[in-house]
């Protein structure tokens, strides 16, 4: 029997244990506790072991933890099954002031599905000291108050809970007051100042006390407040409220006038001392008074302004109930108003610009501005997202929560768009959601990245010569797409030398307007083409710019009248006398009028006309239209007048034409008298010239020696230059120029001509030019006529020495063309048959593309010298004389008058051959030879 009882008891105990185990496994509830502010990795518990799970089955069964709140506070290590702290846990932030604070977790495993509930209690630590709302409180106490009278004080608050929030108060030692702390049903401390000894206002009007609040944590934390007690004269029974603290809940969007609470206080006194009025206490802040209003008679508190949960989610209003006695007494209570949040705030954005204006060459990802977004609402109404308008070279980059950076996403070009107006939109997560926009003006700062450009790389300008000094000839303009200083352009000349003078002595350019001015009158005879560069530079750092080339063609004007070459021996009154035998036939050349014109083109194309004398009969003479040769038109007979006064008009083809006149006196003599007259004239000239013969001989020898040395130097220099590599802006050698002057007056020059062109480089030296008829002729050019070369021009001495009456050197007519103005040259072909000896045909017409001239005086062309022979004559630069170095035979005799005559030469030569032994005739030949040299 006893045995059976014992077995029955054991069975019952086993059954009870199984029931408890089954109940525990079915509930799946685990409890852990950790202190707040635990560090990351703090051990919480062996959750796998406590749940009866093996470590090897955690992963296969998909062990996972879910949280109802923040899921990142706790984490489970699947390797060892330990629950640990993953992030900082702040109990005050997590649970506010709730007595119990727990983190609820749900552990879920599959195969089979099981759910376990885990509760982790967060223990409070003493990390918040007590705090008073004010650093000083003021009380007014009547001196008639009896000992043990109590005066409410605003207590301190502690964010902690439990023992850490259990506050103890103490007062600095004094003989009048003490502290008393009461706790209501909500365990809220109600602090009162207790009067222990009667006050005497006449003895002490003011008392200063220090209240110290100490919490119950370890270690203890404290807070203090100053009490200023003013002693008043007043009353016996004070009004009293039903409660010392009233709690009210109110929506934050409650309109103005909404009733918050109606207070009721009572006073045991009678009469006027029983009548009570209600006021806000002196402890109430002005901000609270602006949002609430109290009816002093009824005690109703109403909303007076806009409430905002985000500004303040609770208000503590201290109310005084004061009787109307002469010495009023007051009662006190506190109304705590707690606000409930609604989604009534749009997101807020704060934009801080860091890099404005933005340079257009700023690198990508440059931070332009920082944008901070926030929403004063809480909960789901609080999260904010930010976005930027599309199709702009910027983007938003989220750096931290509620922080965005506005960065450069693609390259900028200020010349395309200088200002970007960006719109940033911020939107919260409420329902319905609220949004806000903000504008950001991004100005693009200019950098000097645009080269100054002219409309074209080269300009061609035509300017007439003899312009007034300082005249405006052209305006250059360059465009720059930059701004401000980078677009300020200044123009300047690229200074070079033009010949022996600087470019700035010819032209100048205005630095701001780009106007080009001629500083002096331009002379076509000096400069035909002025080529230079104008530079445009901006004011950027570093400055940018470019150059443009100006080709200024100086157009010729007919400003030079034909100039007659002075005769060797003049007649009376500036006229020239010529003796002509009566036996000459038609076409006999009597004399030649020589004239030159410094102009070019048609302005230098000379023609000759014979002006008839008034009242005179038809004379038997004529003048070549373009040669200036005076010849007979018919045979002379005995009936002709013995003397003729011929007036030759020399006229150019300019507009208007300019003229010069020459007078020739022609005397008709018998055939035997002409040589005698010539001999007498020559003999008369020997006397005054004899003194100069020796000097001229020495001078000729010296000049020939110097010229030979200089010719050798020039030949050596030319050979070196031709062997060297040609460079830019250096005059290269052209075809040889052939200018011949012989006894019969025939001369020519090659088709290749070098025109005067003044550029930025110095022209080649042409101080000495030797001309030899023995130079080989270059191959006939079949190319199109080239532009005139400005590097070479005839000197005044060469002009004076030419036998041609038509001086067409550089007589081109400027015509605009693709490559510049072309030169049209009046020409006479050397192959054209001559109608009469001593004349040349007039030019076929302007525009004939030929630069070759051959003038023929006398019955035939002169014979060209051989390669080894010396030239008949050469020209000394700076001297109007053409020196003859040809050796004449001893019996030769040449007679020349002031103007070159040809028919008389041939007749004289025949007579000289018949009289070789005559000594007097030899003297005449020597005199005539000297005269010829002077004339040339």
From Swiss-Prot:
Presence of keyword Signal: yes
Extracellular side of membrane: 29-696
GO MF annotations, alphabetized: calcium ion binding
Segments on the Cytoplasmic side according to the record's topology features: 718-936
UniProt-recorded name of the protein: Protocadherin alpha-5
Compositionally biased spans, kind Basic and acidic residues: 895-909
GO cellular component, as recorded: plasma membrane
PXXP repeats: 773-776, 785-788, 818-821, 873-876, 877-890
Chief location of this protein within or outside the cell: membrane
TM segment ranges: 697-717
Bias kind Polar residues: ranges: 774-786
InterPro entries given in the database record: Cadherin-like_dom, Cadherin-like_sf, Cadherin_CBD, Cadherin_CS, Cadherin_N, Protocadherin/Cadherin-CA
UniProt topology in membrane: Single-pass type I membrane protein
Keywords, comma-separated and alphabetical: Calcium, Cell adhesion, Cell membrane, Glycoprotein, Membrane, Repeat, Signal, Transmembrane, Transmembrane helix
Gene designation per UniProt: PCDHA5
Localization per Swiss-Prot or TrEMBL: Cell membrane
Signal peptide feature range: 1-28
5 X 4 AA repeats of P-X-X-P as annotated region, ranges: 773-890
Organism encoding this protein: Pan troglodytes (Chimpanzee)
Glycan attachment residues as annotated in the record: 264, 448, 547
Function description: Potential calcium-dependent cell-adhesion protein. May be involved in the establishment and maintenance of specific neuronal connections in the brain.
Source organism, top-level taxon: Eukaryota
């Amino acid at each position: 029997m006893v045995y059976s009882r014992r077995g029955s008891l054991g069975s019952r105990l086993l059954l009870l244990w199984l029931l408890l185990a089954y109940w525990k496994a079915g509930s799946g509830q685990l409890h852990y506790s950790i202190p707040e502010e635990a560090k990351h990795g703090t051990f919480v518990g062996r959750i796998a072991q406590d749940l009866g799970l093996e470590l090897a089955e955690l992963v296969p069964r998909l062990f996972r933890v879910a949280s109802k709140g923040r899921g990142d506070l706790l984490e489970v290590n699947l390797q060892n099954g330990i629950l640990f702290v993953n992030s900082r846990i702040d109990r005050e932030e997590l649970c506010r002031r709730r007595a119990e604070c727990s983190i609820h977790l749900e552990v879920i495993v599959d195969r089979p599905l099981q759910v376990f509930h885990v509760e982790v209690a967060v223990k409070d630590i003493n990390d918040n000291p007590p705090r008073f709302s004010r650093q000083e409180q003021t009380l007014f106490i009547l001196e008639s108050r009896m000992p043990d009278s109590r005066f409410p004080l605003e207590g301190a608050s502690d964010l902690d809970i439990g023992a850490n929030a259990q506050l103890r108060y103490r007062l600095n030692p004094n003989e009048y007051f003490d502290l008393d702390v009461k706790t209501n049903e909500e365990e809220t401390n109600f602090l009162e100042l207790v009067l222990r000894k009667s006050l005497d206002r006449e003895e002490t009007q003011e008392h200063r006390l220090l209240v110290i609040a100490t919490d119950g944590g370890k270690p203890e934390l404290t807070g203090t407040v100053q009490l200023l007690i003013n002693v008043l004269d007043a009353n016996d029974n004070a009004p009293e409220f039903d409660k010392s603290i009233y709690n009210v809940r109110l929506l934050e969007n409650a309109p103005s006038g909404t009733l918050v609470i109606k207070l009721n206080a009572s006073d045991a006194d009678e009469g006027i001392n029983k009548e009570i009025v209600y006021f806000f206490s002196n402890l109430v802040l002005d901000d609270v008074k602006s949002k609430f209003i109290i009816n002093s008679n009824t005690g109703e508190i109403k909303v007076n302004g806009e409430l905002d949960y985000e500004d303040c989610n609770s208000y503590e209003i201290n109310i005084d109930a004061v009787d109307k006695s002469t010495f009023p007494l007051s009662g006190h209570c506190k109304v705590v108003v707690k606000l409930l949040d609604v989604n009534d705030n749009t997101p807020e954005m704060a934009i801080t610009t860091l890099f404005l204006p933005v340079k257009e060459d700023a690198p990508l990802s440059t931070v332009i501005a920082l944008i901070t977004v926030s929403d004063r609402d809480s909960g789901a109404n609080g999260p904010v997202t930010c976005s930027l308008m599309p199709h702009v070279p910027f983007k938003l980059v989220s750096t931290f929560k509620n922080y965005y950076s506005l960065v450069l996403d693609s390259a900028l070009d200020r010349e395309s768009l200088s200002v970007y107006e960006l719109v940033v939109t911020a939107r919260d997560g409420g329902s319905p959601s609220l949004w806000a926009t903000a504008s950001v003006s991004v100005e693009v700062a200019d950098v000097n990245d645009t080269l100054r450009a002219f409309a074209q790389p080269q300009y061609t300008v035509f300017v007439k010569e003899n312009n007034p000094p300082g005249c405006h000839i052209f305006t250059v303009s360059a465009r720059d797409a930059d701004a401000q200083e980078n677009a300020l352009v200044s123009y300047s000349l690229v200074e070079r030398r033009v010949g022996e003078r600087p470019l700035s002595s010819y032209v100048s350019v205005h630095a701001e307007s780009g106007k080009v001015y001629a500083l002096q009158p331009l002379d076509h005879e000096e400069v035909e083409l002025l080529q230079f560069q104008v530079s445009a530079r901006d004011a950027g750092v570093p400055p940018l710019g470019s150059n443009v080339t100006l080709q200024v063609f100086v157009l010729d004007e007919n400003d030079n009248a034909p100039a007659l070459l002075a005769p060797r021996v003049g007649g009376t009154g500036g006229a020239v006398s010529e003796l002509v035998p009566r036996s000459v036939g038609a076409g006999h050349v009597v004399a030649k009028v020589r004239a030159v014109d410094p102009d070019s083109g048609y302005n230098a194309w000379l023609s000759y006309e014979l002006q008839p004398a008034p009242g005179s009969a038809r004379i038997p003479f004529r003048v070549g239209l373009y040669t200036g040769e005076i010849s007979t038109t018919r045979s002379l007979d005995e009936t002709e007048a013995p003397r003729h006064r011929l007036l030759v008009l020399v006229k150019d083809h300019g507009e208007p034409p300019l003229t010069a006149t020459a007078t020739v006196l022609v005397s008709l003599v018998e055939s035997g008298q002409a040589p005698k007259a010539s001999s007498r004239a020559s003999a008369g000239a020997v006397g005054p010239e004899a003194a100069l013969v020796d000097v001229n001989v020495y001078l000729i020898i010296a000049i020939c020696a110097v010229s030979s040395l200089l010719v050798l130097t020039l030949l050596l220099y030319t050979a070196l230059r031709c062997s060297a590599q040609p460079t830019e802006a250096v005059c290269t050698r052209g075809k040889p120029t052939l200018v011949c002057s012989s006894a019969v007056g025939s001369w020519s020059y090659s088709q290749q001509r070098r025109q005067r062109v003044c550029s930025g480089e110095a022209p080649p030296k042409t101080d000495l030019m030797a001309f030899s008829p023995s130079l080989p002729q270059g191959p006939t050019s079949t190319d199109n006529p080239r532009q005139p070369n400005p590097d070479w021009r005839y000197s005044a001495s060469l002009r004076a020495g030419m036998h041609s009456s038509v001086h067409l050197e550089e007589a081109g007519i400027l015509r605009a063309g693709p490559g510049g103005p072309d030169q049209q040259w009046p020409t006479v072909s050397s192959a054209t048959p001559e109608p009469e000896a001593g004349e040349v045909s007039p030019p076929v017409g302007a525009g004939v593309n030929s630069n070759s001239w051959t003038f023929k005086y006398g019955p035939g062309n002169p014979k060209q010298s051989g390669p080894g022979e010396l030239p008949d004559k050469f020209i000394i630069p700076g001297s109007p004389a053409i020196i003859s170095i040809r050796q004449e035979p001893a019996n030769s005799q040449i007679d020349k008058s002031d103007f070159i005559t040809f028919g008389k030469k041939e007749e004289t030569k025949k007579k000289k051959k018949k009289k070789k032994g005559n000594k007097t005739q030899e003297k005449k030949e020597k005199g005539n030879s000297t005269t010829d040299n002077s004339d040339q």
